[in-house]
């Protein structure tokens, strides 16, 4: 056990919980909108880095470098697809989603927005969305908790399962207490730390390699390791990752929280720039790690091993806290999205129509705890798969189910409630069926799921009744909204 690194981790944890306590102390009188959406008062820097940090979970420091380290340049297409998708979501989706969510009854969750967008009195769509949220987010959050366990077991030497319990407790604490404000502000600081770690570590490692300081020299590599064009299925699947951004609730909800369209434009520049840099240096960490470290037994710890080899304990502790930052910043956002979906889209409309704001806040907090426990149990299961695999599965479901429907709701005036239901159900179903039965094709399930959902939404809309004049008027109002 390295005591210095442990002390750095403890200080980091205390800082994160302190933010949660601060916003809990300020929350007297807060309502549902404040807890789940920050009162739509997020500034450009906090919004941008919070969206980025909640997106780039521990896989960007462990999963992606590990894939690149083990399999080579063909894995860069994941980064390319994500960069393109992220930029497009900020440029085209963010401005409209912010305005449409306000026009649609000042909606504070994605399921609520979709229901209000069509002025529907039915809660069927909200309930379907909430169920998908709870299941998929439990899997997604498990990847973050698993990453924390891997980090602690590698660096400090404690049991991975014990480490997962500790990480889950910290994440629950500040999310439970502080809500959206705490999540966004912790994500802001964690985004800065992730950026610093990914800039510093590979640059120092490359400098040592060039100066003859490599630990083991370049390790034997698989055939075509340095060729990015060896497999068309890798290229298509990698680019397909970008489709996920259009339907990723815990990311696009940041678009709804921004103060104004002016701030949103600033946020887009900051957010896109941050993400591009993060992805470039994540890939670089895998490639440079191959040259610097040679062959290591567990590719998932390539970034950890590189940092600990180069830097003294105090510096490595700070840089490795970036993995905690990545894991926690994503997990907290997923827990909050699950909580808001249940409290606003199931608990109030189905069970307690007259629930007070205080009751809604506590319903959400209880769900934060329950989903975190489920995610912890998944992560602690040795058969749950890799960090990257868990992320891939959850990412695919969200992108396929919600991406086409969100886009159509923002850009197609004639789009209907029935089309939205069909798109979500078919998209999610095709994604899961492809994962179970056709994964051997090498094509990422989000691609057939996304386009099947898109086709189903279009067919159901054109085959059904046109939307009412009131629904069309809502669309026109949102489009015309200045700020």
Can you describe what each PLM-predicted range is?
Residues 1-483:
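Membrane-embedded helix-loop-helix hairpins and adjacent transmembrane boundary segments
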């Amino acid at each position: 056990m390295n005591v210095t690194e442990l002390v750095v981790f403890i200080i980091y944890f205390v800082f994160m919980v302190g933010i949660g306590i601060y916003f809990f102390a300020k929350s007297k009188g807060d309502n549902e909108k404040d807890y789940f959406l920050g009162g739509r008062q997020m500034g450009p820097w906090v919004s941008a880095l919070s969206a980025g940090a909640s997106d780039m979970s521990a896989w960007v420091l462990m999963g992606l470098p590990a894939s690149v380290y083990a399999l080579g340049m063909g894995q860069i297409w994941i980064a390319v697809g994500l960069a393109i998708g992220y930029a497009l979501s900020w440029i085209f989706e963010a401005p409209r989603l912010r305005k449409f969510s306000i026009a649609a009854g000042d909606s504070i969750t994605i399921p609520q927005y979709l229901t209000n967008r069509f002025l529907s009195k039915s809660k069927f769509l909200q309930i379907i969305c909430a169920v998908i949220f709870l299941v998929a987010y439990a899997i997604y959050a498990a990847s973050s908790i698993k990453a924390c366990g891997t980090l602690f077991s590698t660096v400090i030497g404690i049991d991975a399962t014990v480490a997962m319990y500790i990480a889950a407790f910290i994440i629950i604490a500040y999310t439970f207490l502080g809500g959206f404000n705490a999540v966004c502000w912790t994500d802001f600081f964690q985004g800065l730390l992730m950026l610093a770690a990914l800039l510093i570590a590979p640059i120092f490692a490359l400098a040592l390699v060039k100066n003859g300081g490599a630990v083991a020299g370049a390790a034997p590599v698989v055939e075509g390791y340095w060729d990015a064009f060896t497999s068309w299925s890798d290229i298509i699947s990698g680019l397909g990752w970008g489709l996920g951004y259009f339907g990723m609730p815990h990311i696009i909800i940041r678009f709804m929280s921004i103060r104004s369209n002016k701030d949103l434009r600033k946020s887009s520049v900051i957010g896109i720039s941050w993400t591009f840099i993060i992805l470039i240096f994540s890939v670089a960490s895998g490639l440079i790690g191959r040259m610097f470290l040679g062959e290591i037994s567990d590719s998932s710890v390539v970034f950890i091993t590189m940092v600990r080899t180069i830097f003294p304990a105090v510096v490595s502790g700070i840089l490795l806290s970036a993995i905690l930052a990545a894991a926690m910043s994503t997990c907290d956002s997923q827990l909050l999205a699950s909580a808001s979906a249940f409290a606003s889209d199931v608990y109030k409309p189905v069970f307690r129509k007259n629930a007070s704001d205080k009751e809604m806040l506590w319903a959400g907090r209880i769900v934060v705890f329950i989903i975190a426990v489920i995610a912890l149990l998944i992560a602690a299961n040795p058969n749950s798969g890799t960090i990257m695999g868990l992320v891939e599965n959850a990412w695919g479901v969200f992108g396929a189910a919600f991406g086409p429907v969100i886009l159509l709701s923002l850009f197609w005036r004639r789009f209907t409630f029935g089309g939205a239901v069909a798109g979500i159900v078919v998209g999610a179903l095709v994604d899961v069926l492809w994962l179970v039965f056709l994964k051997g094709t090498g094509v990422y399930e989000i691609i057939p799921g996304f386009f099947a959902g898109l086709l189903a939404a279009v067919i159901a809309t054109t085959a059904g009744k046109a939307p009412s004049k009131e629904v069309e008027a809502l669309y026109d109002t949102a489009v015309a909204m200045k700020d």
